[in-house]
Amino acid sequence: MAEAQYRGTGRRKNSVARVRLVPGTGKITVNDRPIEEYIPFANLRQVVVQPFGVTETNGNYDVIANVNGGGFSGQSGAIRHGIARALLDVDPDFRAPLKKAGLLTRDPRMKERKKYGLKKARKAAQFSKR
């Protein structure tokens, strides 16, 4: 029989991550590359492993993530969301600490659209009273 696999889908901004957790040593692979190579910023790599810290499961699972859309920040958040959801499959008792840390909530903040007549979403040409 194949070893246990736990799946979770995470989303953040315009990124979608499909995450698999496999019992292992804590190796994280994103789009077939090690996380150190894929995400160049240490603070964003810390974001990715947050769910393991909250549930005290550091180094217990290997993570295989496929992520597309968005940039580094959105993709890191999407992977974190996917890992948190997959950990619920591992043990439903993880729900309380993950929810308390806010890791199960899909962050609804999105980029605001640009409006016509303005330079950006809210940036307008300088106003002249006279």
UniProtKB/Swiss-Prot annotation:
Q: Cite a single GO MF annotation.
A: structural constituent of ribosome
Q: What is the lineage of its organism?
A: Bacteria, Bacillati, Bacillota, Bacilli, Lactobacillales
UniProt family annotation:
Belongs to the universal ribosomal protein uS9 family.
One GO CC annotation, please? Answer: cytosolic small ribosomal subunit
Query: What SUPFAM superfamilies does the record point to?
Result: Ribosomal protein S5 domain 2-like
Annotated gene: rpsI
Task: Tell me the HAMAP family matching this sequence.
Answer: Ribosomal_uS9_B (MF_00532_B)
Q: What is this protein called?
A: Small ribosomal subunit protein uS9
What PROSITE patterns does UniProt report for this protein, alphabetically? RIBOSOMAL_S9
Alphabetically list the UniProt keywords: Ribonucleoprotein, Ribosomal protein
Instruction: List the coiled-coil residues.
Output: none
Entry-linked Gene3D superfamilies: 3.30.230.10
Q: Which GO terms describe its biological process?
A: translation
